[in-house]
């Protein structure tokens, strides 16, 4: 048997694949936009590496590369907005992720509307499905992993927005769009208080 192939008794074949590709299978939640406001400038970055860490208060872990313009802003101000775009914004979201706030006013360049938040200086994005105002509550993993722990402090949504499907990055320039919803709330007896 070759080392790159594993044959189980039931005839299922498995092959190895590069560890550098594991994130293609484990991409977490939907692609989001993270806004910051630093030194008089609002900025937007595209982000897909984030995860929920706690229900209440809502804690969100997110990775922001130290090479990103937003890293300095987030580290300096300790606040941001996580805006959740629907799939009708996918082209703009990808374009936002392919330029830098160092030299581009992304709100103007991509025709997005900044709106004032209630508890943070970073702006909401009016065109998004939802916006979560966040404050950085833990930076202990920033130096080693570029990971910020955020607490959601105020949340907004647009109930009249027609397009509500979000999308997920596969990490290779392809995306998966949310589709059919399967309602199994009745089975969630252990977590009923969170629904």
Feature map (PLM): residue ranges:
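Basic, polyanion-binding surface patches
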Residues: 7-195
């Amino acid at each position: 048997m070759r080392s790159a192939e594993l044959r189980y008794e039931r005839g299922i074949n498995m092959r190895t694949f590069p560890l550098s590709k594991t994130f293609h299978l484990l991409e977490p939640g939907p692609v989001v936009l993270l806004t910051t406001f630093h030194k008089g400038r609002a900025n937007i970055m595209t982000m897909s590496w984030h995860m929920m860490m706690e229900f209440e208060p809502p804690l969100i872990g997110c990775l922001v590369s130290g090479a990103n313009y937003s890293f300095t802003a987030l580290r300096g101000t300790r606040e941001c907005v996580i805006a959740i775009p629907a799939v009708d914004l996918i082209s703009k979201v990808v374009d936002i992720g392919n330029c830098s706030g160092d030299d581009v006013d992304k709100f103007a360049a991509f025709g997005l509307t900044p709106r004032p938040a209630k508890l943070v200086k970073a702006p909401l994005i009016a065109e998004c499905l939802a916006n979560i105002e966040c404050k950085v509550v833990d930076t202990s993993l920033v130096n080693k992993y570029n990971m910020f722990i955020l607490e959601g402090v105020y949340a907004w949504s647009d109930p009249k927005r027609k397009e509500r499907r979000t999308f997920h990055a596969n990490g290779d320039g392809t995306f998966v769009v949310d589709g059919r919803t399967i309602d199994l709330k009745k089975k969630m007896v252990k977590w009923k208080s969170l629904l």
